[in-house]
């Protein structure tokens, strides 16, 4: 069973990712009127890579048995 700090960690992760996505959606919407399509494509690639990066971090944390918050 996952501990409470792990659940908080995942929740904060999710919040950061959704905030980051929202920010990039706003930026791409504002840029989309004046900039070409390639800029919006690059922004989508950045969001996908950020999500992939989070998955890799979660996978590595799971391999090492989660995060140990105690100093003992």
Curated annotation (Swiss-Prot):
It comes from the Viruses. This is Uncharacterized 8.6 kDa protein. It comes from Vaccinia virus (strain Copenhagen) (VACV).
